[in-house]
Design a protein with these regions (language model features):
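Nucleotide/pyrophosphate-binding catalytic subdomain
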Residues: 1-171
């Protein structure tokens, strides 16, 4: 959505759904082209998989997605998976891409899930506090609520809380 916002300047005021659909349609094309170019430099083919939360709700759609990505991986094609924001209904959208990545990792029986962030990790205090440090290892079941702020970056819908919740679900 953000990528498309920089490209398109609507002639009239749009409601939030129309904006999301317009910007995501344009942004998705930019995004997949960028991934294509980056991976092509290493002779690695990529393919686009657009999904919705509804696609995880029925066995038929779930298995179809899994089969698609399995065939891609068997043929050394990297699936670039993203929510299909152009048709996603607001009430049924993923919390964020972390939730989507967790569902994909579980679906594909992935050996690992790497969740990226603009924060170095979970701190034992406020990340802005110079006396705080990253917690290097977290025991399974440890309560992290005292360490995680519910804030999120201006770039997305989630935050560190969502990341840790997804990590716990996938690890179980």
């Amino acid at each position: 959505v953000a990528s498309g916002r920089s490209e398109v300047h609507p002639q009239k005021k749009l409601d939030s759904v129309d904006q999301r659909q317009l910007f995501s349609a344009v942004g998705q094309a930019k995004l997949i082209n960028r991934y294509y170019e980056l991976f092509r430099e290493h002779s690695i083919p990529v393919g686009q998989v657009l999904t919705t939360k509804e696609s995880f709700g029925t066995r038929r759609h779930y298995l179809n997605q899994k089969n698609c990505m399995t065939v891609m991986l068997e043929n050394n094609v990297i699936p670039i998976v993203n929510e299909n924001d152009t048709i996603s209904v607001s009430e049924l959208m993923f919390t964020d891409n972390d939730e989507l990545s967790g569902l994909i990792a579980s679906m594909m029986d992935a050996q690992a899930l790497i969740i990226l962030s603009n924060i170095d990790g979970i701190y034992n205090g406020s990340p802005a506090d110079p006396g705080s440090s990253v917690i290097r290892e977290i025991d399974h079941g440890k309560d992290l609520s005292n360490y995680i702020q519910a804030t999120k970056s201006s770039f997305g819908r989630g935050g560190m809380l969502t990341k840790t919740n997804i990590a716990r679900k996938v690890a179980d």
